[in-house]
Regions:
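C-terminal output helix
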Residues: 86, 106-111
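Conserved acidic carboxylate
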Residues: 8
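Charged docking surfaces used in two-component/phosphorelay signaling
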Residues: 15-23
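Receiver (REC) domain active-site loop signature in two-component systems and cognate sites
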Residues: 55-57
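Acidic catalytic/metal-coordinating carboxylates
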Residues: 33-36, 61-64
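Active-site beta3 strand of CheY-like receiver
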Residues: 46-52
Length: 111
């Protein structure tokens, strides 16, 4: 079973993502900020297949978290979640190590 780390500060979006991923058969760990994601990732010895990261969060944002996770592992898939839809935002995410970018709002099938 694939293990996914979800980091999203908005409760409704995080719940939507988690519910849909669990329904699809994934093992999901969710947190609401970058600092908690680092803590969980470290405590779990990086035992995740994919990380879904919101970009705009208080404290450690998704860009910094993406860079940190990528320094820990080149194996984990990183997907950025954001309401930003400009091409440059997508390019920036890919340049810092993300594998994909999903624009909010999104449907369960996009996950």
């Amino acid at each position: 079973m694939k293990r996914i780390l979800v980091c999203e500060d908005e409760d409704a979006i995080r719940d939507f993502v988690v519910i849909n991923l669990v329904r699809s058969g994934y093992d999901v760990v969710d947190v609401s900020c970058g600092e908690d994601a680092v803590k969980v990732y470290t405590e779990q010895n990086g035992n995740f297949d994919v990380a879904l990261l919101d970009i705009m969060m208080p404290g450690m944002d998704g860009f910094a978290l993406c860079r940190w996770i990528r320094e820990q592992s080149s194996e984990i898939g990183i997907i950025m979640l954001s309401a930003k839809s400009q091409e440059m935002d997508k390019v920036n995410c890919l340049m810092i190590g993300a594998d994909d970018y999903v624009t909010k709002p999104f449907s369960p099938s996009e996950l």
